[in-house]
From Swiss-Prot:
Its main location: cytoplasm. This is Imidazole glycerol phosphate synthase subunit HisF. The keyword Cell wall biogenesis/degradation does not apply. Disulfide bonds: none annotated. Heterodimer of HisH and HisF. The gene is hisF. One of its GO terms (cellular component) is cytoplasm. It holds the Pfam family His_biosynth. Its EC number is 4.3.2.10.
């Protein structure tokens, strides 16, 4: 098993980092570059940037801040937001991103996953999945979650989409558990465990981190490859060096700070 990854997530809106609860009521958390530099210095393994307004607004990510980040940090980072065609992905990678992530565009055009994998290699292609548990107990996919007014409920079951995304060429899956997002009550171990059983590529957990034990639990119980979090890092509730030390004490292999 490779070292487990600790991944701060930076939701971007109008050139600023924001954070909401269950994908709503976003508040400003700071400057993109300042936060990226802080996480680089504190030992993050990689960063994920989501331009949360891009897909709902029908536009692509702003390449200017991607270039600014790439010039200043030396850790891998992934960019998501409005990447609906190969040339847009090419521009994001050319601006300096190491990986691109697609979510709503992949739902609208599943063949995009294959096209991106063929153009850039599966190692560059991440599929993000926003998932919520419905009244019948099934987890299903949501689309356009960056704007609550445009969010769409789909009949597609989350676990079915995980299988299909891999078949099409996804090199990594980030599972955003919407019921847990921003509430700091722990990752959705039940959902992530079922996803793990079907996921042959790296799986990253997202949504629910509130304390260090939550990270240990998701690594031990769901066997994910990485844990993504936002509010606990942005607020300073958890420091990455302290978290990595805690995880080592729990016999979880992580990279040095």
């Amino acid at each position: 098993m490779l070292s487990r990854r600790i991944i701060p997530c930076l939701d971007v809106r109008d050139g600023r980092v924001v954070k909401g609860v269950k994908f709503r009521d976003h508040v400003d958390m700071g400057d993109i570059v300042e936060l990226a530099l802080r996480y680089r210095d504190h030992g993050a393994d990689e960063l994920v940037f989501y331009d949360i307004g891009a897909s709902p607004q029908g536009r692509s990510v702003d390449y200017r801040w991607v270039e600014r980040v790439a010039r200043l940090i030396d850790i891998p980072f992934c960019v998501a937001g409005g990447i609906g065609e190969v040339e847009t992905a090419r521009a994001v990678l050319h601006a300096g991103a190491d990986k691109i992530s697609i979510n709503s565009p992949a739902l609208r055009q599943p063949a995009l996953i294959s096209a991106l994998a063929e153009a850039f290699g599966v190692q560059c292609v991440v599929v993000g999945i926003d998932s919520i548990r419905e009244a019948d107990g099934q987890w299903r996919v949501r689309c356009n979650t960056g704007d609550p007014d445009k969010t769409q409920a789909l009949p597609l079951r989350t676990l079915d989409w995980i299988v299909e995304a891999q078949r099409l060429g996804a090199g990594e899956i980030v599972l955003n558990c919407m019921d847990s997002d921003g509430v700091r009550c722990g990752y959705d171990i039940a959902q992530l465990s079922q996803a793990r059983a079907l996921c042959q590529v790296p799986l990253v957990a997202s949504g629910g981190a509130g304390d260090m034990q939550h990270f240990a639990d998701v690594f031990h119980k769901a066997d994910v490859d990485g844990a993504l979090a936002a509010s606990v890092f942005h607020s300073g509730a958890i420091s990455i060096p302290g978290l990595k030390q805690f995880l080592r004490e729990q016999q979880i292999e992580v990279r040095d700070v």
